[in-house]
Regions:
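A detector of single, family-specific signature residues
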Residues: 1-222
Length: 222
């Protein structure tokens, strides 16, 4: 979690959901609350700065908004808890399933489950391009004069869940496999953005996954 989604922020807003309540908190209590719930990331100086900002806040003290903030945080925490349970169940299922794509460095059980769940029977796809199209990772060719370039672009078509899982998995694979890292770096060196370079790598990963699932072979780029 990062930004607004931090345990320290939730803990503070549940106890003091308005600037007035934060401003009136005892400094020691405020500093300790933030420190404990951020595992030491919030310092006493930051707590002081926060209380000063709260004291300077001119916003209306609306109790209805305070109640809404508290209830929203409780809903987020409930969803977080449910998500963790689902992810734990997915991990157990994927460990039992022992799919060949788990041999891909960095792919992870959750991405594995999302990818396999969306693909279903790999034999529905007679070639990797059909799987690419299903994922919304469409191979395209741009031509201008004597220049021809092939790219993999993101599309709003296809399975959004599969596309999300593939792109997320691809970034993990890039950071854990030298061949994919070199391919990513080469695309970046060509002047492509991080997202476009990742799209190329995702296209490569789809072809690898298609081959692995079709032939029931483990990850091997040699």
């Amino acid at each position: 979690k990062s930004g607004l989604h931090q345990n320290a922020v939730y803990a503070l807003l549940k106890e003091a959901p308005s600037p007035k309540e934060i401003a009136s908190m005892h400094m020691t209590h405020l500093a300790n609350l933030l420190k404990v719930n951020s595992h030491g990331h919030f310092t006493k100086e930051q707590a002081k700065e926060l209380r000063v900002l709260a004291q300077k806040s001119v916003g209306a003290n609306d109790s209805a908004i305070s109640i809404q903030i508290t209830q929203t945080i409780q809903q987020i925490e409930l969803l977080d808890s449910q998500l963790k349970k689902i992810e734990a169940e997915m991990t157990d299922i994927m460990k039992f399933n022992d799919s060949v794509i788990m041999t891909i460095p960095g792919i992870g059980y959750i991405n594995d489950g999302m990818i396999l769940g969306e693909i279903g029977d790999i034999h529905r796809f007679s070639n990797p391009n059909k799987l690419l199209a299903f994922a919304g990772l469409v191979p395209s060719v741009y031509q201008s004069g004597n220049f021809q370039a092939k790219t993999t672009k993101m599309s709003k078509r296809g399975s959004r869940v599969l596309r999300y899982a593939l792109v997320n998995a691809t970034w993990n694979v890039v950071r854990n496999n030298a061949t994919f890292k070199a391919y990513y770096d080469a695309k970046r060196a060509e002047g492509r953005s991080h997202y476009k370079a990742l799209g190329h790598c995702a296209g490569k990963l789809v072809r690898v996954i298609w081959k692995m699932l079709t032939d029931e072979v483990e990850f091997n780029l040699e």
